[in-house]
A protein has these predicted regions:
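Charge-dense, helix-prone N-terminal extensions
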Residues: 1-109
Length: 109
């Protein structure tokens, strides 16, 4: 799997606007994982991104257009969701998803 370099740059710019601090990216699952310290909160793929959510945010997130459970190997992976590129075509939407990912690092519940 590859990743969308344009979406990665937009995500890094959005994280800077959020004042997220030092975020790095590295290869994970064939995507570019966004890391805060040694913990991943999102990853950019070729036509979607995955985001880790707080458990309490998961049910509402799954009702949004372009969002589904992240299911590598056919089974849902914890509180991770997959968000299509269309669902993050606007920068405010992208920032909202990245902010949700960062919240999951502070409190998983």
């Amino acid at each position: 799997m590859s990743y969308d370099a344009g979406l990665l740059q937009r995500a890094l710019d959005a994280l800077d606007q959020l004042g997220a601090g030092p975020v790095r990216h590295r290869s994970v699952f064939g995507m570019r994982g966004l890391m805060f310290g040694d913990r991943m909160f999102a990853a950019i793929g070729s036509d979607s991104m995955i985001v880790k959510l707080r458990r309490a945010e998961l049910p509402a997130a799954l009702t949004r257009p372009g969002v589904s459970a992240f299911t590598p190997g056919g089974s849902p992976l914890g509180n991770w969701v997959e968000v299509t590129d269309e669902a993050v075509a606007d920068d405010p939407e992208l920032r909202d998803w990245l902010a949700a990912g960062l919240r999951s690092l502070r409190s998983p519940d």
